[in-house]
């Protein structure tokens, strides 16, 4: 689960006549990725497969469009009986053509309407800046005393216009879009400005005769609305027709996917006069299974690829439980893991929801996010989307952790429903919220962790400092583990240069923050005080104060200096070896990349995790501010009175929608940033290729 599966390169040699049963066996196994043979027994390919695979893929795309427009879940169903895969591909392709023919008119109508709509929308976009002009442009351009020109230009043309027009004439412009301007030019008739501007490449707006921009804009808008109505009616007609043969369409779709994969094997195979050669990758632990399946049909052999130095890197297969496999979609944003890399998914399954929950600690907001995620998951499934359900499950995991942190923080759509005006005004004479005594987490728990609560009724004068240290401690731990994984990856790669000149210097650097912020373990009862003392010792060591009183501080400074010098030297050697630089420039570049940049990254990456505290604070105080505004507009001095006031309710709803929508999105993005930039960059390159086996999408009879 943590490491990619060991792969072998499988070679199958058989009589040409055995091709169909061999392909059937490989499809049923669903664990074989075909490749072009390394040492082909001949140059001859199976031409029928090469010719058919393009047509089959085209049918797959068309059926997906039909299913999507018809509102069907895009999934394969049914079975297929095969004696010859070439014959099966021809038959299924013909069947798909007949199916598509039944929807041809509706699809063409939808396509025509979409094209027409796109054309009108482009015209609207061009008219948008001048849509408020109610005068015909032809009348504007034919004044007796002045030349009037209205044009759309870029920044370079705008400067050119100012040079041509000079100071004696009038130029007015306003910006719209990126580096685009609408320009109104009024000039005297005798200077022939229109001709000069045409020569400079400036073209004035020309519209249909007899209509102002205002009239034309509204006519086009009305036409688009009419097209939308017709388009919706046509889609409904298509959806109704598709529903009547849903299972048949899904069966044809499944058969197309299956013959496509069969043709993919055949397309990469090589044949001679008598023999067939098939090669590809297969998980090593399942080799015996494939041997048992095709032992009586063909001769099979395999080799184990080296992890480093091969011309072709094997595909990567990381077998994960279904419950966490969805996180693969997040990792793939960064890139697929290489064959020798530790998968970051297992790392991500814990850290991503935890960091999200710490930055979004509100039970009510998290509950809304959970319900939205469940709806979004069902919506994605209905649309047949691959990414929406995966993203939804990630949000579900994250919102569950946010519910837990919200319970501990005693926040439910802000501080008002639980802490009440007592918390908002920090005054014990006011009432608590209606949920105060009903809260599932007793107040004693919040009292016990008050040293880590940076806000709310139970926070203390030092809790902000403690939470800051705790946030950086999380970062130090994450960076240490990330750099350690980088060393392990380098060892697995069996590349000494990669290990000793890239990953080991990085690991030695990121030992420093974990040592500093974990030093408090030496005295757990005074953990945060000890950490603050160590930070003080480091400052004293930098300022060259007494050695005997700051031994640990001096040790940390010396270790950091050694690690930075090592990183400097390592980068200098890499620049010298790979960029053919002189020693002088190599040392200079090594200092910039390894010494100076290394020190900056050590500091910035570690401190970057303070954003965990910052976003938790911002979430709380956004809702605190709206709760206070609700208190100000309500005439009541009791919490219940505020919560039932209509204007106060509207203010609280607006504040919570802002927190859920904007803050939730920002926290999700920042969580991704902490993983991709601060953590993954220490050990994960993501330059591999994903294992994509061929398989049977329907039952093979």
Swiss-Prot record:
A GO-annotated cellular component: plasma membrane
Disulfide bridge partners, by residue number: none
Name of the protein this chain belongs to: A-type ATP synthase subunit I
Membrane-spanning segments: 340-360, 363-379, 388-408, 435-455, 468-488, 498-518, 555-575, 583-603, 612-632, 649-669
Membrane topology: Multi-pass membrane protein
InterPro entries associated with the record: V-ATPase_116kDa_su
Species of the source: Saccharolobus solfataricus (strain ATCC 35092 / DSM 1617 / JCM 11322 / P2)
UniProt superkingdom: Archaea
Keyword annotations from UniProtKB, A to Z: Cell membrane, Hydrogen ion transport, Ion transport, Membrane, Transmembrane, Transmembrane helix, Transport
Family: Belongs to the V-ATPase 116 kDa subunit family.
Chief place where the protein resides: membrane
Subcellular location: Cell membrane
Biological processes annotated in GO: vacuolar acidification
Molecular function as annotated in GO: ATPase binding; proton-transporting ATPase activity, rotational mechanism
UniProt function note: Component of the A-type ATP synthase that produces ATP from ADP in the presence of a proton gradient across the membrane.
Subunit composition and interactions: Has multiple subunits with at least A(3), B(3), C, D, E, F, H, I and proteolipid K(x).
